[in-house]
Amino acid sequence: MNINDQKIIDTHHHLWDPNTKKYDWLTSPGHEVFNKVYLLKDFNNDFEDLNIIKSVHVQAEINLENTVYESEWLQKCSDDKLNNKHLPNAIIGFANFL
């Protein structure tokens, strides 16, 4: 069976937009290649050959003052009427228990 025929659930991916909120790790040494906008359209383009039917977004280390914003933003992405798969289908947000 070809991988393209398989239904895939991506259980760990990230989206971010450093133009709207701050992600400190994007500017730290060694992460320069990631310091760009990476939205759902980019995710879909990167994996267009795969049959991703659902996905789980894991928090992308947005600054602590923006953790709720990140989950709200991702929910809006999922709810967008142009997003026919409603990705991400699950969101794992950040919670500081310390």
Task: Provide a role label for each language-model segment.
Residues 1-98:
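Helix-coil boundary/capping segments in enzymes
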